[in-house]
C-alpha cells in the first residue's frame, strides 16, 4: 500500500519528500538533500502554478513534524522555504501565506531550538517581502503582525510565550536573544517598518527599550562604545589576509576565546546578557537610521518618551536638576545622533507635542518635568537640528509655562477669583517652581545653536511682546504710547488666545519670562569649546526690541521690577558695543533740501528721493523705536523717583539703571537723561511739602548721575567736573548723601537683598546745605567736546579696535552704520548733532515728552504706510534681472510680528539694514546726464539690452557747463552725495503717468509716456541704431557708457573745452569717431548720432587707434575683451553735422 500511495502522489509532493534526508537521532543540524532541492527549485520556478501546492504541502508537513517533535524535519522544511524565497522572490506573494503559516506553527511550539531555527527563514522573508501585498491584504497583514508580536514576546520575557522550562537565567537570555534576532530582521527592512503606519514600531520598540533599560546611568554609553568596537572588528575581519593552506589550525585556535576560557559560568552568563543588550542596541540603531520618513521618526520618539515616562512612574526615580547624565538622557541624545540630519528636528517636535498633552496639574508635574528636562538636554547638546522652527518651540514652551502658572489651567481657581481678576491666587509649589526654572533654562538653551541671523532678536522680541500690565499698573500704560505698530506691537504677537493673555498678566509669568530673556542673552554670548563653530553668525540684539516695555519698571510687584532691570542690564552688558556710543542720526534728505551738486530738474528728484528714503525707512523706524524707548524709560524713572523719593531701594535701583545707560549708550542716553534729571532737581527744590529724606535722596540721585557723566566723559580735570566732585564730597561729609549712591553702582543682587533695609541716621537737616546744580550749559559743552574726541579716536583706530569705551569683541555681526563712508572723513562728523545738543539744552516736561513720543509713533506709522503703499507696489515690477532682497517684500503678507519678530513689515530680517544695490534714477527732458545712468546703461554688453533713450535733451545752461570738463575732477563733480547713498537698497521703476514700467531693474527702458506729456511739444524721435555713427561725431548721449567697475576717481580722457555749447576745436577727423560702447569723457555728454553709410575699416589711422587704446584702459577687462569682436568703422557722412553735440538738435 505504501508503494501504491507513493506512486499516486503528485510530482511536487514527491520532489518535496525526496529533499528530506535519512538521519539519526541526536544530530544537531539537518540539511536537505542538495540535488533534490535543486531540482525542486527548478521545477517550481518553471511552473508558477505549483508554488501554492508546494506551500500547502509544506504547511501540513511542518504541522505534523512539530507535533511529533521531529526537529530535524522542521529544520529541513524551514530551509526549503528559505531556498524557495531566494530562488523565486518575485512570486513571494503567491506562497507568502504558507510561509507565515509554517512560521506561526513553529513559534507556537514554544521550543527554543525550533524557534531559533525559524529565525533565518523569517529574516529571509523580511528581506524579500512585498510591501504592496502586505498593505493590500488585511488578513495576511494581521497574520504577519501576530508572528512579529510572538517574536517580540520572546524578547520581552513574557512567561506566556515561553516554555515553562525556561526557569534559569541562561535560558531566559537565550529566549530574549532569539526574539531580538527576529526583531532585527524586521527593523533591517526599511519597507517593513513603513508599510503598516508605525504599528510594528509600537510593538517591537518597547521590547527593545526594555532590554536596554538599566538603573545604571552609563549603560547606554558603554554599549555604544562596544558597538563601535564591534563594527571596527568586523571591518578588520572582512579585510583579513588569507591563511596559508600549509598552516594547520585547530578548531580551538580559530574560534576559541582565551579570556572566556579562563572565566566561570557566571562570567559567561554576564557576557551573554551583554551581547543580548548589544543586539537590542543594534535593533534600535536600525530603526533610527532607516527612519528616513518624518512619520517614522515621530512614532519612534513618542514610543521612547512614553517608555521613559512609564519607567519613571513605576520606579519613582524621576529626573532632576542634580541628574547630569542618566539612562534616559543618554538614550535620547544617542537617538538624536543616529537620526538622519534632515529629519532630526522631528524629535523635538514630537517631544513638544507630548509636553502639550500633559495637563498642568500637580499630579502630572513629574511627567512635565521629565519631558522638559529631555528637551533641554537636546537643545544644549552638540547635536545640531537643522530645520528646527525655533519660534514655534519657543511659543510652545511659553504656552506650557502659562498653563503652569494660570490658576484656571491648574484647576485651582474659584469663581470669586475669576470675578476679581488675576492676582497671585495660585501658590506655586516647590515642584511647580522647579518646572518653571527648568523652562527658563530650556528657553535660554534654544540659542545654543544659531540657525539664522535674527534668531536671538526674534526670540527676545517674541517674549517681550506678550506681557500685559497688572490691574494696578493700567494707568502707566494708558498714559504713555505703547509699542509701535511698525515694529510689530504686542497686539500682533499674541497667537495663543486668551490663555496667553491671562498667564502673562500674572507676576510669576512675567518674572519667569524675564529670567528666560536673561538666559537667552547669557547662552547666546557663551562660547562653548566643545561645539563646532556655526556658519551663521547672529545679529546684535538692538535697543528697539525693548520698545513699549518701560512700564514693567513701574509694576506693583517688586520682583517683577527687579527681574526687568536684571534682564535689561544683562542686555546692556552683553549686547552693546562701541557703535552704540555713537549718535545715529536719521538718514535721508528732506524733500525741500536737494543735494549740493544735484543738477537734476524737479521732475527727476522725487523718484530719486523715493528710492533713497525707501532704502532708509527701516533704519528710521528702528531709530524712532530706540529714541521712543529711551524717552519713555526716562519718563518712567522720573515718575518713580517722584512717587517714591524716600524709598532707598528704589532710588538705588534707579541710580544703577541710569549709570548703566550712560556707560553703555553714552550720549544716546544722556540726551534724554540729563534734561530729566535736571527737571527732577527743579521739582524737588521748588516743590513744597517735601520731606528732608526725600530731598537728600533725590539730590543724591541727581548728583550721582552727574558724577557718572563726569566719569564717563573724562570731566575730572575740567571746572564743571571738579565742581561736581566737590559737591558730592561735601554732601558725604555733612551726612546729607544716600550711602548706596556711589560709583561703581551697587550690584543688583545686593539691592534685592537689602530691599527692606531703611537708611541709617541722617546728619544735619538743613535744606540750605543742598546746593542744586546749575551748570547745565557748560556741562553739555564739555560732553560735546568729549564726544568729538571719542569720534575722532574711533575714526582713526582700526575697525577691530573696541575703542576707548565698549565691551570686548564678540562673535556678533553688528549693524552697518549708514553713511559712514561719506561722513567719516568730514570734520562735521566729529561734532555732536545740533538736534541732540538742542534737546539737552531745552527744558524737560512730562507733557512734552509724551507729545514727542506720540509724534514719533505717528511718524513711524506713516513710514510704514508709505512703504506698503508705494514702494511695495514698485517691488512687484521686477520681472527680469536680479532683484534686491529688500525689494522683494509682498504687500499681501499680514503685518504680524510672527512673520518678522523684529517687527518691520518686510520679508527680510530687520536688525541689519540692507545696503546692497545701486539707485535707479528716472530721467526726463531738460535734465543733465547723471553718471549713475551711464554706469547702469553701459554695464550691459549686449546691444539688445542697451537702454533706448530719446535724443531730445535740453540746452545746457551756465550752471551745467562746469560739469563739462576734460579734467579728472569732472566725474567727481558730476556726483552728488545722494548718489553715494548706501541705503537705497530698493530699486523702484519709473511710474510716470500712473503706469508702471515692467522692464528689468538692471536694464530699464525709458517709458514712452514720459515723452507724451505735452502733445504740442517736439515730436518724439526714434532711437538711433547702435551700429550707426557719424564721422567726427559722438554717439547719442543716452547711449554712452562708463564701466560699472571703473572707479569714480579715475581720470577721464582729454577733450576740447566747450564754450556756449560749441566746441573750441571741431573734431571732424574721420579717425576720431568713437564706438557706442566707449566713454567720451568724465561727464559723458555727447552729440546725437546720425544715420550713415557703412564705414570702411581700412581707413583707421594711428590717431584713432591711440584714442581707442586710451579708452580701453578706462573700461573693465570684460568690456575690453568684447571690443575686438564688435569694433566697426564709422561712416564719413551723416544726416546732420555735429560739432560738439551740446545744443538742442535743430528740427
Curated annotation (Swiss-Prot):
Residue ranges with Basic and acidic residues bias: 598-607
Q: Which GO terms describe its cellular component?
A: plasma membrane
Compositionally biased region (Gly residues): 1137-1147
| Composition bias, Low complexity | 883-897, 959-978
SUPFAM superfamilies to which the protein is assigned, alphabetical:
ARM repeat
What InterPro entries does the record point to? ARM-type_fold, EFR3, EFR3_HEAT-like_rpt
- Pfam families with a match to the protein in the record: EFR3 (PF21072)
GO biological process terms on file: protein localization to plasma membrane
Q: Where are stretches of biased composition, namely Polar residues?
A: 903-926, 1057-1072
Q: Where is this region: Disordered?
A: 582-615, 877-929, 942-1097, 1114-1147
Q: Which domain of life is it from?
A: Eukaryota
Q: Spell out the coiled coil positions from the record.
A: none
UniProt record similarity statement: Belongs to the EFR3 family.
Its name, as the record gives it, is: Protein efr3
